[in-house]
Amino acid sequence: MPKRTDIHKIMVIGSGPIIIGQAAEFDYSGTQACLALRDEGYEVVLVNSNPATIMTDTTIADKVYIEPLTVDSVSRIIRQEYPDAILPTLGGQVGLNMALALAKTGILDELHIELLGTKLASIEQAEDREKFKELCQKLGEPVPPSKTVKIVEDALAFGDEIGYPIIVRPAFTMGGTGGGICHNHDELAEIAKNGLELSPVTECLIEKSIAGYKEIEFEVMRDSSDNAMIVCCMENFDPVGIHTGDSIVFSPSQTLSDKEYQMLRDCSLKLIRALKIEGGCNVQLALDPNSLDYDVIEVNPRVSRSSALASKATGYPIAKMAAKIAIGMTLDEIKNPVTGTTYAEFEPALDYVVCKIPRFPFDKFPKADRVLGTQMKATGEVMAIGRTAEEAMQKAVQSLEIDEKDLYSAKAHKASDDEIEQKLVRPQDDRLFYLAEAFRRGYSLEDVHELTKINFYFLDVVKHMVEMEKEIEANPDDLDVLRLAKKYGFSDQTIAKLWHEYPDQVRDLRKANGIVPVYKMVDTCAAEFESTTPYFYSTYDGENESRKSGKKSVIVIGSGPIRIGQGVEFDYATVHSVKALQKMGYEAIVINSNPETVSTDFSVSDKLYFEPLTLEDVLNVCDLEQPEGVIVQFGGQTSINLAAGLERHGVKILGTTVKDLDRAEDREEFDQIIKSLHLHQPQGLTATTHEGVMKAADQLGYPVLVRPSYVLGGKAMEIVYSKDELEEYLHDHADIAEDHPILVDDYLDGRECDVDAISDGKTVLLPGIMEHIEHAGVHSGDSMAVYPPQTFSDEVEEKITDVTKKLALALNCKGIMNIQFIVRDGDVYVIEVNPRASRTVPFLSKITGIEMAQVATRVIMGESLEQQGYADGLAPEPEMISVKAPVFSFSKLADVDSYLGPEMKSTGEVMGSDHTFAKALYKAFAGAKMQLPENGNVLLTIEDRDKEKILPIAKRFARIGYRIFATKGTANFLKKNDLHVELVTKVHEDEQADDNILNELRDGKIDLVINTMGHDIEKNSDGFIIRQMAIQQNVPLLTALDTADALLKSLENRSFATDALK
């Protein structure tokens, strides 16, 4: 059926900020969908609150609204734009839930707006646990015994009836939010209560656990003519019981017999047809490893995380196809863009193995609960492609950018047998390394299977790699063993370690004997049809399919997996760099390892290499492509860390030189530059021993800021107020080495700001200065920021501009850089310089209209700022005021302290823009789900040193009609200052009392918690427990008084003044 001509304007709802469970994959799918709809001639209106995405670029849709994803906000835009239809199935769970909420308000019926793609009834049938169960039973498809409940008591009664373990699955949530496995009555009571609170319809499915079954996923497509097809079948390495987002995944399935595959394929097709889904959907199934029994777990009636993985694994662009199906086209009339000759109804065939491994945030949160279950904890993922499962898995491990570069972990090696068995029975994020260690210690396949329930085939893959380690170690410099090792994915670094050599020696031996990788094409059809996709992976098997073209080429290194501190913002910069290179006539080549992102869409660059971002893999691509040079400024710390090694091997680093990159990052050299330019910076000392750190702190006087050098995202950075705290910090970060000294700085309390600057060596352009709303001490990635600045005088802005220009020229910056300042008493202090793109590039690019990554790329390639039409100094400020607010995923990470400090904790961001600061703040808070009633109850739990500062804030809350709750000390102080305060008892006082803090939170009496008890970082301390309870109960929580002040500004703007005349 040809595309529809009765609709002209389509609204696409985005997925909002990045949180655990909903990451960059929706930027990828949303971008694809918008472009596909525009290609077909429709006007596209996009609504999304996340400025860090390619999707919210003005080139992606005809109209782009970066506004809060609330019913009020989206309804206002609908009334402004009058779209004919809305496409909600590409914005993840947020987009789906928004469509349902809009339908309930009646606005869609009132304005005759149609929902494209999957119909509302189908969405409800798939997402509503009870309706879905009824459908499966009607179709004769098996589901585990279960019951839908709306109250905790019903959950407990059902648990007693069918026995434990039991799985709780809240309705209309994603990433396993609020769910979990319960082994007893108490766990079920707690998890069911939490799940009911987090489900937008207050409903949970309580089902008998089938943990231990194989977990299989099918990505399925269907059109309005009932053509349906399987895009991809994926098999989880981990059995049922671990969320698929936290599981290692292989495609195609590795252990299914043809009979099992066909049986599960038929079930998936039957389900998508019965649900009448139009577009893409994800079916999750559980298969008994010992029989042909299976159960249906769930269906996601939308494009999902797995769809992005399936798209990259097969080359089949699911979101693009789903968008075309939504406008009425059918699979037999849509061309497959990979081959250009076959149609979209042909099922992809793979002649390689894909392995996905999740990337977890526990390097940032060492105290978090790392045990994996049905609630997702990973922030991102990597994907690798090889000819064998071993090769794909090894390459994926190398892509993770963690301490382990292969299957050997020093921590696992030191563990006792008991500890290893514990880790296998209760799997954590690092289980793969403990599996390998178990085989090193002689555990049999049967032993390990008994402990883990992981399929024998996957265990054998791990065991084979451990056996290969021994063979490599026993045969140094043996060419046959080297060939075999490379075939199974062993890196030069690992081989060098086993041979007690340097990686360069292994590389030289390889190259001298012609042992070099070939590059194979990902073509969706296992080479059955002619294909010209510029999408490649390396392997040591067969002939090379990637040829160097005649054009001049430049390699842009991506930023790898999404993690806290290095998010989708860096992918945004990578994509824009590619666009600029293409406009300048260069062949733009991307190397990256992240399946969720736009940069790894093969239609974005001229050539895509899906490879680990290691020195070996990047050099191999450089050897083949012989580029003009490599750009490292846009891939965050990942690409910067590769610069020196690439240069050592003769690869030209474009833009700022390696020597100058080092001068910015090396503390002593940087201090010399600051001194020579007569600039201010907080007094600081460097120490390489624990004693040295203690001495430095005494010399400077507390509080001090301590951090390791060469870090991103403030990892292991803390403000320390006393000797005891410093000793605890050193105990927690005991791995300080000579080559990574600790920096100890005098902690300055002032206004912090961020500047991104572009320099060509003569002219320095400052697109804007972003003022932080929180005082210094909160990491810039976790701080709210406003542009243009609201409290800086012209004189201060001039000083910041002047210092930025001096530093850019002194550091010989060529391209982009980021500087962080503290402004105190009119003086400007330099905190740090990052000689690369920062996470603020997308935000600032969107609101200034200056495409910073593109301008910087042109500078890197030799085009001056003057030639591009930019003048020296600070760019003119726009009329609109824009606020960036961080978004956190604490509800997914048990035991992570939510108190904000110098170590970054946010996973995403939103933006609010308006003509006044208060309105921009209101939108930013609304986008970050911090919407408060006009009057309510606020709980104040304040450290003694903040008591004076809280007084004006408390008075303003009282003035707009809020009741104030506080514990004894704070309450007495506020009462003395004429405020009416409701007294609550402390955490460990009368725990049964109704007015105990925790009971007040549990009973839903509190609308906002302000908690500045930053020293209460122990898990049993009052401050920590209150913060955790607020997060569990979904109560907005602020830990910085500046944020409370900003929130008040937005609330005061909404409320009317009620002043007595007398």
Curated annotation (Swiss-Prot):
Residues 1-401 are annotated as: Carboxyphosphate synthetic domain. CDD domains: MGS_CPS_II. Keywords: Amino-acid biosynthesis, Arginine biosynthesis, ATP-binding, Ligase, Magnesium, Manganese, Metal-binding, Nucleotide-binding, Pyrimidine biosynthesis, Repeat. It comes from Lactobacillus delbrueckii subsp. bulgaricus (strain ATCC BAA-365 / Lb-18). Residues 930-1062 are annotated as: Allosteric domain. Residues 547-929 are annotated as: Carbamoyl phosphate synthetic domain. Mg(2+) 3 binds at residues 820, 832. The gene is carB. Residues 402-546 are annotated as: Oligomerization domain. NCBIfam families: CPSaseII_lrg (TIGR01369), PRK05294.1 (NF003671), PRK12815.1 (NF009455). SMART domains: CPSase_L_D3, GARS_A, MGS. The large subunit is composed of 2 ATP-grasp domains that are involved in binding the 2 ATP molecules needed for carbamoyl phosphate synthesis. The N-terminal ATP-grasp domain (referred to as the carboxyphosphate synthetic component) catalyzes the ATP-dependent phosphorylation of hydrogencarbonate to carboxyphosphate and the subsequent nucleophilic attack by ammonia to form a carbamate intermediate. GO terms for biological process: 'de novo' UMP biosynthetic process; glutamine metabolic process; L-arginine biosynthetic process. SUPFAM superfamilies: Carbamoyl phosphate synthetase, large subunit connection domain (SSF48108), Glutathione synthetase ATP-binding domain-like (SSF56059), Methylglyoxal synthase-like (SSF52335), PreATP-grasp domain (SSF52440). Mn(2+) 2 binds at residues 298, 300. Mn(2+) 1 binds at residues 284, 298. It catalyses: hydrogencarbonate + L-glutamine + 2 ATP + H2O = carbamoyl phosphate + L-glutamate + 2 ADP + phosphate + 2 H(+). ATP 2 binds at residues 707, 746, 748, 752, 777-780, 820, 832. Mg(2+) 4 binds at residues 832, 834. InterPro entries: ATP-grasp, CarbamoylP_synth_lsu, CarbamoylP_synth_lsu_oligo, CarbamoylP_synth_lsu_oligo_sf, CbamoylP_synth_lsu-like_ATP-bd, CbamoylP_synth_lsu_CPSase_dom, MGS-like_dom, MGS-like_dom_sf. Gene3D superfamilies: 3.40.50.20, ATP-grasp fold, B domain, Carbamoyl-phosphate synthetase, large subunit oligomerisation domain, Methylglyoxal synthase-like domain. Mg(2+) 2 binds at residues 298, 300. Residues 930-1062 form the MGS-like domain. GO terms for molecular function: ATP binding; carbamoyl-phosphate synthase (ammonia) activity; carbamoyl-phosphate synthase (glutamine-hydrolyzing) activity; metal ion binding. Pathway: Amino-acid biosynthesis; L-arginine biosynthesis; carbamoyl phosphate from bicarbonate: step 1/1; Pyrimidine metabolism; UMP biosynthesis via de novo pathway; (S)-dihydroorotate from bicarbonate: step 1/3. This is Carbamoyl phosphate synthase large chain.
